[in-house]
Amino acid sequence: MVHKQKGSALLSALFLMTLVAIAATAMSTRLQLDIYRTRLTLESGRLMLATQVMSFWAMDSLVNPNTKLKQKVDGGAVLVYPESMSKLYPEMTMSGALYDLQARFNLNNLQDVGYQSVFFKLLKNTFKKAELKDLQYIVTATTHWVSPYQPARGVDDLMTYYYEQKPPYLPAYQPMQSITEFRLVAGVNAEIFLTLLPQIVALPTSTPINLNTASPTILKALGNGLTDAQLTELLQLRDQKETFKASDILLLVTNFHIPAAQVTVESEYYLCAGKVSGKELSLNYYMVLHRTKDRTGAMTVQVVTETLNSM
């Protein structure tokens, strides 16, 4: 009887020790998770603060009259974030660039009939093997998307297309708020969207194209469409002058038969795109800036949109 009692006591002690070990392990695991979660929260906060370094750099660069905003790579990057400032925020690495959004074609310009032919030529030059009727359909559908609703139009082929999607949806009937809306337009598949993405943008107002920063693909679509010889001549002139000035516009639009309203040599809209990396997390940062100049030449910059990890 005594041996049975000792065995029961031993089993009870082992059971209690097991419970204590399980509880201690659970508490230790919970503590580790809390510490890790706190560390991630603190690092997220530091990442957010580090992005402000890039935003101040971008705004300061845009208001500085000595800053040379010249295209560095195809796509409109006009200024690269200095490597000397990449470690400015402790324990963070920052990189990025400032992009000229008026180096791209603004889809919201399509409300103006004059830009519809420019967009068609951009599509034609980009998708050389595509049927012209398919490209014209995209121009028509995109114009329909960004234009105000017309009750007299009724249900047409475009409306039928949107109704048949799963799930069905309606066009915006207003300027695009994000370039991702273009993927929803009738006739635009993933390949077309991704191919055009570096050349297009959706800005809140109608914007002319900057001759100083636009890519050859965009320049070739201007006016009635530049020939290869005209495009080469224009690019050579741009390289010789480094940057076109306002006084050069009249000569350029006359020689290359480009409507003056379609082009400019100074942009208003820019994109600051950057990446901030910490020990365990990283963050992509996008900020659209609007620069204006008053009569005295003084420039001011305002933030239009600010997003994280997606535009």
Predicted regions and their residues:
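Compositionally biased linear targeting/interaction segments
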Residues: V2-K4, S8-A13, M17-M311
